[in-house]
Each structure stands twice: as C-alpha cells, then as structure tokens.
Amino acid sequence: MQNFLPFSRPAIGSDEINAVVNVLGSGWITTGPQNQQLETDFCAAFGCKHAVAVCSATAGMHITLMALGIGPGDEVITPSQTWVSTINMIVLLGAEPVMVDIDRDTLMVNAADIEAAITSKTKAIIPVHYAGAPCDLDALRQIAQQYKIPLIEDAAHAVGTRYGDQWVGEKGTTIFSFHAIKNITCAEGGLIATDDDELAAKVRRLKFHGLGVDAFDRQIQGRSPQAEVVEPGYKYNLSDIHAAIAVVQLQRLPEINARRQALAARYHQALVDSPLQPLFVPDYAHQHAWHLFMVRVDKERCGIDRDSLMARLKEVGIGSGLHFRAAHTQKYYRERYPSLHLPNTEWNSARLCTLPLFPDMLDSDVDRVVDALATIIGPHRV
C-alpha cells in the first residue's frame, strides 16, 4: 500500500524551525517580541487597525464576547454549521445561542435568515467564513448597522481571504485561527483583528489576567509601579515560541494559498462529472483561501453514504475529514434544543466530506484521491 495521505498536514520548513530555535536561545520564550512582530506584520498584511494574538481562536471568541458584555439574558445569532466552540462560549457566558440555517451549497448564513432571528435580546451576530470563502459581508454589515448589533466574523477558515477589494479582517472585528490544520499554523494559536480602539484595549487586558501590560512589557518597564489588575481576566496569551512560527507562516502565506488554489482547481476539474457535489463558490467578487476542499456524498447520487465512503478511503490509505457535524446535533445541544430543525444544515451535516488538501501535496496526490473515489463510487453509482 502507498503511504497514508492525511487530509491535512502542516507546511513546516527550516525557516519555522530556525525561528523557534532562535526564541529558545533568546532568554525570553513566553509572550514578548515575537508576539509584537506577529501583530505588527498581520496589520501590515491585511490592513487591520489592531491585532491581538491569543492562544486559540476559541479564546479569542470568548474574550471578544466578554468585551462586548455578552451575558445572561442575551442572545447571539450564529449558524449551527460551525465548529462547536463558538456555541460553547456563548453558553458558558450564560447567553443563548440562536442557531440559524445556512445556504445549502456554500454553507454560509444569509442576511435574511439573520434578520428574521433578531429580537430585542440579540446582542451579537457571528457569521462564519466557510472553507476559505467569505460571507456576503455587505449584506451582513447592513443588517448589523441597521439594528446596531455588533458583528463578529469567525474567520478561522479565512486567513488570506478577500471579499471584493478588502481583506477579511480589514474592517470590523474578526477572529482568526492558527490551529495545526489552518492556512497559517503555529500548532495552537489565534488572533483578534478589530478597528475598534476600545474593544482592542479590552481584549488585550482580558487575555492576560486583566493587566494593562503583559509580562514582557513589565520586564522592560521594570516592576515599579507594579502593574495593576484593571478587571478579572484570563490566561489566553500566546507564547513567543508559537508566535515565531506564525510570523514565518504569515510571510509564506501567499505561496501557501496559491498552492491550495492550484490543488483545488485540479480537484474541480477532475470531479466535474462526478456524482460528488463540491461546495459552490460564492458568485460575488472574492479571493478564496481554500482552507478546505469539501464534497457532499449523497447516497441517492453516489450509491454509498458519507461514512462508508470515508471508511473505504481509509482502507486505501487516504484520510478525510468532517467539517463539521452541526452543533445542534451534538448530544448536549440536541437535548437542549430538541425541536430545533435546520434543513440545509442537517442535509449537509450528514453528507460533508473533506478531501486531502495541504500545500505540500503533489498533483499526483490529488489524482490518487480522485482515482480512489472513482473506484469506490463506480460500482455503487446510481
């Protein structure tokens, strides 16, 4: 059998390794100059006014919601078709997640469904940029402005994505992820981008115990006067070991995303006559980051269900993924919201399959996946 082909693998090279070695030898390995470099470089790359590095996108979402005062009695509108951490953070703050349906073919929310879910208790809207494509931000921003509700963009999949002539993260408040499978990775990490001065200052405090400065600032400035806790906060800062990797990855992002684009194009060309159904790309102007390449496996079209197809791929040494099982179908939320029915979300949740896509893949790897799919589906195809 050929070597196992995972659905994702981080593109880590000698530059990232050397950056970590330099930090380890610097005498300062926690939050420090590499964090500052990452935040500065991110703002320069994407036109952000403020960038605040954190230990994960989940942490970033948590303290952003906190900074906006989200709490008991509040409602936050977001899709169920997302990683469950966003829903968890809303619930842990005592607020109510109002989960809405998605477009069947792009997996993203539309403004009409968001508007229909707004009540007097709505305190935030969290759309998700999916698989590397952007939401229709103009329509969403118009709704948010009309009702004076904060918009928090979940861009865990969308570093290097453009909406029209703007980068995702250039305007408003946006949460990015640097998790191991993301387009930029530092193993674990995230970043909050915002053009709101007050929000930026607040999340910077909340990420580090509620202090006005971090440990590196206090070392440089000395400990007199002693830094004070302005408000209770968390330990969500990013170490410089992680930040150093992200700095290099950010420099490499154009080549990383270009390779992802080429691989996605090869998949699309090869699957044009397949009963598998790739996600649609939005019809508005955008630049896709191709974080994931996803297909829908419909048994009526393919003669085999998604789970069986994934098992067969594994048997021939090919990994695949599920991004994601809808949040409201998870045990806790299924029991909490037993009557919630989101048709497009549920249809996709039962059929989504993520195929291998990462920068170090060869064209022949794509061909191997496509050939395996044809072999598996061939005898079953309806």
Curated annotation (Swiss-Prot):
Pfam families: DegT_DnrJ_EryC1. It is an enzyme of class 2 (transferase). Its EC number is 2.6.1.87. Gene3D superfamilies: Aspartate Aminotransferase, domain 1, Type I PLP-dependent aspartate aminotransferase-like (Major domain). The keyword Membrane does not apply. Pathway: Nucleotide-sugar biosynthesis; UDP-4-deoxy-4-formamido-beta-L-arabinose biosynthesis; UDP-4-deoxy-4-formamido-beta-L-arabinose from UDP-alpha-D-glucuronate: step 2/3; Bacterial outer membrane biogenesis; lipopolysaccharide biosynthesis. It comes from the Bacteria. GO terms for biological process: lipid A biosynthetic process; lipopolysaccharide biosynthetic process; response to antibiotic. Belongs to the DegT/DnrJ/EryC1 family. ArnB subfamily. This is UDP-4-amino-4-deoxy-L-arabinose--oxoglutarate aminotransferase.
